[in-house]
Amino acid sequence: MIMAKAAAQKASAPTIDTALLAKLTGGLTDRKTIAKIGADIGHLYSEFLPDTFHSETGIAIDVEYIGSESGLMTDLIANVGQNVAVADCSLRNWCPNFMMAVGNGFVIALMERMLGASPDSIGDPDERNLSHIELDLAAMVLGRIAGVLRSGVNAPGGFEATIDPPFNANGKSAFDEMIAGLYGVTIRMKIDIGKVSSEFSLIVPQRPLLKTSIVAPKASAQALKKQEEWMDMISQQVKRSQVTLEARIKLETLTLRTISRLVAGDVIPFQDLKQDDIGVEVSANGSKLYNCEFGKSGDRYMVRVKNNVSTDDEILRHLMG
């Protein structure tokens, strides 16, 4: 009887509100403080990320602070949207479980720029998940975003941020259990590359943020070295990526009068039809790469490479623009 009464009293005991408990223990703050922290980090990114990105890639971007939002970490992560790549991140002596997200549109547009497309030719990409190579590029982008954050929060020890491999929004975070019940902040930034406008987000538990003083980073003396490292990593990705090739075969010279009278079914011979092989020029991104010969193997037409027009390094530079 006594045990039953004690159990009933325990069941009826009031439970403390989770938000109130978080406030009392330093895990949740007011809107004004959140707005100040968000604006400070937003200013850090808008001031330093474009210069850092340009010095390491040679590509210009614009970054602008959008706003911040407070809430449970699980809710904030669910609200980043579907057209993003997400990564679990940590920074020793600062925060073991924050997350970053970058819009897929920015990554796709950046990949096109790396492969030689001009800024004016790149429009808003279709909404889709990123491929494996695009996720690799997203990791590099998030690494630069994390680098600016690291320099601003000034965590003791000067450690670099750890970024797990990014995943598409339908993936699963390794932090799900760790962040359950934690309150956090989403800091949203607009990021433009050419005509493509996208976003990236920083989702951080409030507890480490409330202990952080944002400071402007010092100019890096390693910019050139980082640029070389960046280009080397992109080069490796390009070597493993698929690039659309174009083959051009010269046709027999015709008069303007003849060309104007061509109709469906007319045949135009190759210019080199009388030679042993038919010459083909293979190019990518408007740059001539190989001299080839045209032929047939079984039921398939194909070209055979005869010689390089450029060196391997020149070919790679053509493909990267």
UniProtKB/Swiss-Prot annotation:
Keywords, comma-separated and alphabetical: Bacterial flagellum, Cell inner membrane, Cell membrane, Chemotaxis, Flagellar rotation, Membrane
Origin: domain of life: Bacteria
UniProt entry tagged with the keyword Cell membrane: yes
Gene3D superfamilies, sorted: CheC-like, SpoA-like
KW 4Fe-4S (keyword) present: no
CC annotations in GO: bacterial-type flagellum basal body; plasma membrane
Main location: membrane
GO biological process terms, semicolon-separated: bacterial-type flagellum-dependent swarming motility; chemotaxis; positive chemotaxis
UniProt-annotated location(s): Cell inner membrane; Bacterial flagellum basal body
InterPro entries from the UniProt entry: CheC-like_sf, FliN-like_C, SpoA-like_sf
Record's bilayer topology term: Peripheral membrane protein
Bilayer-crossing regions: none
Function in brief: FliM is one of three proteins (FliG, FliN, FliM) that forms the rotor-mounted switch complex (C ring), located at the base of the basal body. This complex interacts with the CheY and CheZ chemotaxis proteins, in addition to contacting components of the motor that determine the direction of flagellar rotation.
The family this protein is said to belong to: Belongs to the FliM family.
UniProt cross-references to PANTHER family, sorted A to Z: FLAGELLAR MOTOR SWITCH PROTEIN FLIM, YOP PROTEINS TRANSLOCATION PROTEIN Q
Protein name as it appears in the record: Flagellar motor switch protein FliM
